[in-house]
C-alpha cells in the first residue's frame, strides 16, 4: 500500500514521532532499579543489554534486548508496509527509535543508551541477509575482546558491504546506514565522556 503522496498520508509521519518517543523508554533503567535499588548510571553502568546483564542478570538483559530490538524493527516495518518503503519516511522511521534511545526526550535529551539493539532491529528488517552474518562476525569479535561495542564496530560496516554486494534497494541501504551512523554518533559521545575509545 503506497502512502507517499497527498495530504491523506501526512498521518504516516506519526510513525517516526511515536518511534522517537517509544525509543526513549529504557527498560534497563527500570529493571536494574527494581533489582538493585539504583539506576544503571548510579551503579556506573549503561541502561542497555550489556549493562542490564551485569547489574540484573541474563533474564533481565534478554527482556531489555527484546524490547529495544522491537522498538527499532516495528517502525521501519510499519513505514514499509503502510507507505510502500517511501524513502524519506523509511529513513525517519529508521533513525527515530535509535535517536530516541540515545537522546530521550524523557531525560531532557541527555544521553540514554547507545542504541545498538534498536539499530540491529532496524537493520534486521531492512536487510536480514546482510545483517545476520555480519552480526555473527561482530559477536565473535565481541566475545573475543569481551566488549559489546565490537558487535556494531565490526557488524555494521560488514553489513553495509554485504548490502551492496546483495544489491539491497537503495532506500533500505540509506535507512540502515542512517541508523548505524546514529549509533556511531552516540558512541563517539560516549568515548569523550569516558575518555577512552573502547
Predicted regions located by residue number:
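C-terminal membrane-associated helical module and adjoining short loops/tails
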Residues: 159-198
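Nucleotide and nucleotide-moiety/phosphate-recognizing core
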Residues: 60-63, 70-107, 138
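Cytosolic, membrane-interface loops and tails of multi-pass inner-membrane proteins
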Residues: 30-61, 111-112, 193-198
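N-terminal signal-anchor transmembrane alpha helix
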Residues: 7-36
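Interfacial segments of multi-pass membrane proteins
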Residues: 53-56, 79-80, 115-146, 158-167
Amino acid at each position: 500500500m503506497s502512502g507517499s503522496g497527498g495530504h491523506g498520508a501526512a498521518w504516516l509521519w506519526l510513525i517516526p514521532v511515536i518511534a522517537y518517543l517509544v525509543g526513549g523508554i529504557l527498560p534497563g533503567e527500570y529493571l536494574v532499579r527494581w533489582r538493585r535499588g539504583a539506576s544503571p548510571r548510579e551503579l556506573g553502568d549503561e541502561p542497555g543489554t550489556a549493562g542490564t546483564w551485569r547489574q540484573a542478570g541474563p533474564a533481565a538483559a534478554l527482556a531489555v534486548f527484546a524490547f529495544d530490538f522491537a522498538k527499532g524493527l516495528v517502525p521501519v516495518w510499519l513505514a514499509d508496509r503502510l507507505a510502500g518503503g517511501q524513502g524519506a519516511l523509511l529513513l525517519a522511521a529508521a533513525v527515530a527509535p535509535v535517536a530516541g534511545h540515545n537522546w530521550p526526550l524523557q531525560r531532557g535529551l541527555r544521553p540514554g543508551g547507545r542504541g545498538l539493539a534498536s539499530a540491529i532491529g532496524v537493520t534486521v528488517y531492512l536487510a536480514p541477509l546482510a545483517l545476520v552474518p555480519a552480526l555473527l562476525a561482530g559477536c565473535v569479535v565481541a566475545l573475543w575482546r569481551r566488549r559489546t561495542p565490537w558487535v556494531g564496530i565490526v557488524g555494521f560496516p560488514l553489513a553495509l558491504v554485504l548490502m551492496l554486494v546483495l544489491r539491497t534497494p537503495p532506500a533500505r541501504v540509506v535507512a540502515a546506514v542512517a541508523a548505524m551512523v546514529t549509533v556511531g554518533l552516540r558512541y563517539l559521545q560516549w568515548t569523550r565522556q569516558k575518555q577512552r575509545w573502547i
